[in-house]
């Protein structure tokens, strides 16, 4: 199959969004965030600073190590600029990124085999998907000194209860690893509080950036398409690490 344009990739990607979030964990992602938390968590700075002082050291799962070795082999054979699509779900965003960046190698990672199995291959040869735990995969990249040109984190599981802060990407012990990967980083969410927390946490680890609303053109994920069609406000954090 020949490579498709970005417009064609988006138009032809008609996979279904199931009830399971495309990202961390197994909670469902409702159409509108249901939460009692109306502002950034008061414990966020303390937690991020704790993680900076006490590096995350969870052993890497074997399937994630094997997935990383696949990437490492391909990267060593053809060291193109590397773009990582963490929590890629069905991989629509990975395919769109590959179409947008033909000069790069785009890798989508997700911990769910069932979500990855729903991927629709659309012809581009500069991307592939791996089943891996994102946080451990980040550490593998850091330890192997493989830098990122760009990193995308699109609509991560919001974990909307205030008590679930440590389950959010920016509350996780692995969050400071992002600073060591370098490159441009973009995170998108349909929850303003989550996006504001992410921006605050990113600055604490050395990534000042911008937070704004935007209109997706084209939508990068199935969830983004759904949220946009239903008129939800979408939030975007963008920043660049100096490595």
Spans of model-derived segments:
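Class I SAM-dependent methyltransferase "Motif I" SAM/SAH-binding loop
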Residues: 87-91
